[in-house]
A protein has these predicted regions:
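Asparagine-centered strand-capping/turn motif at beta-strand->loop junctions
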Residues: 144-148
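Glycine- and acidic-residue-biased ligand/ion/polar-headgroup-sensing regions
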Residues: 85, 96-115
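A short hydrophobic beta-strand segment most commonly corresponding to one strand
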Residues: 100-102, 149-166
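N-terminal leader/capping segments at the start of a protein or of a new domain
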Residues: 1-47
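Short acidic-glycine-tyrosine-enriched beta hairpin
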Residues: 115-142
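Conserved short histidine dyad/triad with adjacent acidic residue
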Residues: 79-94, 137-139
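A short glycine-rich, His/Asp/Glu-containing loop-to-beta-strand
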Residues: 55-86
Length: 176
């Protein structure tokens, strides 16, 4: 029963998001509405448990699992559930599409960057935790950071499925 309810509620939420963004260029205001829709979905803790979406085993080399919950046939409006159980740090990157990250359980720090002559420079940071989220426009660089300890569960939604983002831009010490 929970699986059927989960599929229905996810479908209803993605339909609202799709309608909100239909036939217009993405803006920070639209992304803010998408973030609010996903915060509402995240409040349905009865549908998203660590039992149904477990993090990697403690002896695994992986520190996070990404579960695809929904994606349109054309690979748009891709919604994932990210679950992490260990130290996770991603280098600064630009998804080249919009992204919204919303907390369900635990804390994920998002740091934001501008390009600089020597690579990138941090300009802001926000903690994603239950009831909060961040919205990221195409062309914006960010990183995610999760500390080991308590599991973290978040929604990550993108304008295109991750497997379709062949032009993503990453910055690290080797790439200046």
């Amino acid at each position: 029963m929970a699986g059927e309810d989960r599929r229905r509620v996810i479908s209803e939420t993605v339909d609202r998001i799709r309608n909100r963004a239909a036939n217009q260029e993405m803006t920070p205001e639209i992304l803010s509405g998408i973030k609010d829709d996903l915060i509402g979905l995240a409040a349905r803790r009865d549908l998203f448990s660590l039992e149904d979406f477990p993090p990697p085993a403690t002896d695994s080399k992986r520190r996070s699992c990404l579960y695809r919950l929904s994606e349109d046939d054309d690979h748009g409006f891709a919604l994932y559930l990210n679950v992490a159980s260990g130290d996770v740090s991603a280098p600064p990157h630009d998804h080249t599409t919009w992204a919204v990250i919303v907390g369900i359980e635990g804390q994920e720090e998002n740091r934001f960057y501008n390009e600089a002559p020597e690579g990138v420079e941090q300009i802001d940071s926000k903690m994603v935790e239950p009831g909060t989220g961040v919205a990221i426009m195409p062309g914006e660089f960010h990183t995610i950071h999760i500390n080991a300890g308590k599991p973290v569960m978040n929604f990550h939604m993108y304008g295109r499925g991750l497997e379709q983002l062949h032009e993503r831009k990453f910055w690290n010490e080797r790439k200046r």
